[in-house]
């Protein structure tokens, strides 16, 4: 299979499947053959990213992700996507291990957020983004690393609210339990109170909440990073977005 999209997945498995579903739903196709070819590594046993970043585990996930990226390149993929924000702590190593492009979910999300702000019903310049993500993503500062060159300040929830986000990700979504609208809106409102111009679902598990609670229909200032990556993937594949 040539010119396929390589999906470096399994981080986590549910987000990977949801990401593929998003791409299919977003692509303007009237028959099977008009959809995007994808080769997927749903490598669920990759060591925990957050545990390694926080120093709670000595088992690095980097080698496994580099190996998967190289496997996708060898299989003929034209570019690679990684539907996991936390894994982008290792982005440069993964990118440098292959000769094909690797889309960066964080860069794509920040760029989209800036453009989306100017297209709102009441246009707003995006200067501050609230990041809802794993402890690993927050502590590693990956959003701030990519946000600073774009002129965007990226801020995390206060510690008590970060614990609530951690609970949603690990004890509810990954464990197969639903998250209530009240719970996620409490955190979103907290970020609005910190002066954020937009709130980023910066963990692909949180994308499940975004979908299930239809936050995109009611919260113009909430942006799902997985949705942005899926959109960018469709466009980079040379396909049109479905209206």
Pin down the residues of each PLM region.
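Non-catalytic structural scaffold of enzyme domains
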Residues: 1-243
């Amino acid at each position: 299979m040539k010119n396929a999209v390589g999906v470096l997945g399994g981080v986590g498995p549910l987000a990977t499947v949801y990401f593929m579903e998003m791409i299919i739903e977003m692509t303007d196709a009237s028959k099977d053959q008009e959809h995007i070819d994808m080769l997927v590594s749903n490598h669920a046993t990759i060591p925990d990213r957050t545990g390694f970043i926080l120093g709670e585990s000595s088992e690095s996930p980097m080698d496994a992700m580099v190996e998967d990226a190289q496997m996708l390149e060898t299989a003929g993929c034209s570019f690679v996507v990684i539907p996991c924000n936390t894994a982008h702590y290792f982005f440069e190593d993964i990118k440098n291990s292959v000769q094909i492009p690797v889309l960066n979910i964080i860069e794509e999300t920040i760029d989209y957020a800036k453009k989306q702000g100017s297209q709102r019903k009441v246009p707003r310049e995006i200067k501050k983004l609230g990041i809802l993500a794993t402890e690993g993503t927050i502590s590693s500062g990956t959003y701030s690393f990519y946000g600073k060159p774009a002129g965007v300040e990226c801020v995390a929830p206060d510690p008590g609210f970060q614990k609530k986000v951690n609970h949603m990700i690990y004890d509810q979504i990954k464990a197969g339990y639903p998250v209530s609208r009240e719970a996620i809106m409490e955190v979103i409102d907290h970020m609005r109170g910190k002066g954020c111009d937009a709130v980023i679902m910066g963990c692909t598990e949180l994308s499940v909440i975004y979908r299930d609670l239809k936050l995109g229909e009611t919260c113009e200032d909430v942006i799902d990073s997985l949705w942005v990556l899926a959109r960018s993937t469709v466009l980079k594949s040379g396909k049109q977005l479905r209206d």
